[in-house]
Amino acid sequence: MDPNTVSSFQDILLRMSKMQLESSSGDLNGMITQFESLKLYRDSLGEAVMRMGDLHSLQNRNEKWREQLGQKFEEIRWLIEEVRHKLKITENSFEQITFMQALHLLLEVEQEIRTFSFQLI
């Protein structure tokens, strides 16, 4: 795992949590939950790739991993759209910076998951 990506996840989640406390927006809750879920999925895929011996057990244990992978890409696309929308409508510089970092992180993680998944195929 890239330590920068892990710290980026933690930073984004912390920033979004602060934003959530300052606003009554319920949709930030969903975004935070999705980010946490995405982080866990990315980490588990990365671990499976690092232990290539687990590749076959991963595939045998969970025949639906390709379907799950597709769902994660859908979640990433949804998050990217949500973050872009938030970025367009916000005027607060703290929020703009947070959403710009979140967008960059999502694009980076999408690429990492693609790389992991190609290694698992």
Curated annotation (Swiss-Prot):
Keywords: Host nucleus, Host-virus interaction, Transport, Virion. GO terms for biological process: exit of virus from host cell nucleus through nuclear pore. GO terms for cellular component: extracellular region; host cell nucleus; virion component. InterPro entries: Flu_NS2. A motif (Nuclear export signal) lies at residues 12-21, 85-94. Belongs to the influenza viruses NEP family. Mediates the nuclear export of encapsidated genomic RNAs (ribonucleoproteins, RNPs). Acts as an adapter between viral RNPs complexes and the nuclear export machinery of the cell. Possesses no intrinsic RNA-binding activity, but includes a C-terminal M1-binding domain. This domain is believed to allow recognition of RNPs bound to the protein M1. This is Nuclear export protein. It comes from Influenza A virus (strain A/Puerto Rico/8/1934 H1N1).
